[in-house]
From Swiss-Prot:
Gene name tied to this protein: rpmA
Key words, A-Z: Ribonucleoprotein, Ribosomal protein
Gene3D superfamilies: 2.40.50.100
Positions of the propeptide removed during maturation: 1-15
Modifications after synthesis and translation: The N-terminus is cleaved by ribosomal processing cysteine protease Prp.
GO molecular function: structural constituent of ribosome
InterPro entries according to UniProt: Ribosomal_bL27 (IPR001684), Ribosomal_bL27_CS (IPR018261)
GO cellular component, one term: cytosolic large ribosomal subunit
Similarity remark: Belongs to the bacterial ribosomal protein bL27 family.
GO biological process: translation
UniProt keyword Ribosomal protein present: yes
Organism taxonomic ancestry: Bacteria, Bacillati, Mycoplasmatota, Mycoplasmoidales, Mycoplasmoidaceae
Highest taxon listed in the record's lineage: Bacteria
Name of the protein this chain belongs to: Large ribosomal subunit protein bL27
Length: 104
């Protein structure tokens, strides 16, 4: 046979032109949530003002204090803020709003 075909195998490899870079797991940070007491013991407060911002019930609502859906404590009436310890071993804290008459 005059026409003989030779099959040749060409091995072609492409190498990276740029170095591959892995990702890092750092580089994120959340904003501070500004939790904690907004009114101290003995301070005057108006209806609707926030007394304590919290996650979970670290401080429990007392008289004239409401509990929001995010566990925020707020005043239900005007008056003075009063923190009290209660429970066995006085291990829990309750905040109340005591009605206060101003001397005119």
């Amino acid at each position: 046979m005059n026409n003989k075909y030779f099959l040749t195998k060409i091995d072609l490899q492409f190498f990276a032109s740029k170095k591959g870079v892995g990702s890092t797991k750092n580089g994120r940070d959340s904003h501070a949530k500004r939790l904690g007491a907004k009114k101290a013991d003995g301070q005057m407060i108006r209806t609707g003002q926030i007394i304590y911002r919290q996650r979970g019930t670290r401080v429990y609502p007392g008289v004239n204090v409401g509990l929001g859906s995010d566990d925020t404590l707020f005043a239900l009436s005007d008056g003075l803020v009063k923190y009290q310890k209660f429970g066995p071993k006085q291990g829990k804290t309750r905040v109340s709003v005591v009605k206060h008459k101003l001397d005119a």
